[in-house]
């Protein structure tokens, strides 16, 4: 029997978001910034329910509206494009997602420069999609560049540095460079332990990756 009790808070939240969106549409109009924000909030809720097609339609509407109102490179437009790219990738539309993420990277670089964390995170996201397409060489190049910049600007123990290091280890593992991948992931575990402790969620996740690597017959 399906347990629906745990789903009820999420269903209630989505209903509230729908009501808020309708109120905003009626009071302010379809293209008002508050309406577009309410639309994106509802898309997030639908995404959490697994209703990816409905979420994607709302995200597409928000992207179009923000492009008209704010322009292609406004931070709010880029945020909406980023959410749409995630939905596209989750539905298997990797090439479309990659094109949008490349657009985000260009926009972030133009607004913030190459070394800003938002730019570096955008490149990190792009690398994930590139890797999902099987282009591990390009993904590795992107992640190595992000890691070098993040370590230089913010230090190797910065959370973004450690996340990038772990992502790079995953790509190296997929490429078949198991020894280097394991060594890099081990560094992540050690720095997570020193920085956040053994019981931190990020530390436990890093340890779980190491354990997965050790169980792999190919290691």
What do the predicted segments below correspond to?
Residues 1-219:
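Intrinsic-disorder-linked linear interaction elements in eukaryotic regulatory proteins
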């Amino acid at each position: 029997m399906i347990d629906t009790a745990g789903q009820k808070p999420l269903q209630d939240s989505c209903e509230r978001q729908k009501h808020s969106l309708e109120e905003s549409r009626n009071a302010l109009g379809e293209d008002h910034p508050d309406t577009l924000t309410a639309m994106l909030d509802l898309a997030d809720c639908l995404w959490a329910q697994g209703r990816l097609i409905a979420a994607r339609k709302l995200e597409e509407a928000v992207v179009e509206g923000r492009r008209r109102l704010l322009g292609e490179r406004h931070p709010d437009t880029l945020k909406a494009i980023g959410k749409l790219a995630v939905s596209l990738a989750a539905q298997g539309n990797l090439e479309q997602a990659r094109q949008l993420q490349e657009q985000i990277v260009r926009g972030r670089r133009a607004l913030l420069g190459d070394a800003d964390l938002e730019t570096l995170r955008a490149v990190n996201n792009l690398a994930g999609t590139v890797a999902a397409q099987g282009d591990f060489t390009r993904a590795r190049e992107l992640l190595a560049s992000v890691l070098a910049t993040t370590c230089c600007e913010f230090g190797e123990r910065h959370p973004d540095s450690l996340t990038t290091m772990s992502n790079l280890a995953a790509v190296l593992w997929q490429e078949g460079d198991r020894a280097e991948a394991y060594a890099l992931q081990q560094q992540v575990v050690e720095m997570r332990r020193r920085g956040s402790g053994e019981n931190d969620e990020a530390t436990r996740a890093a340890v779980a990756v190491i354990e997965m690597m050790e169980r792999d017959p190919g290691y």
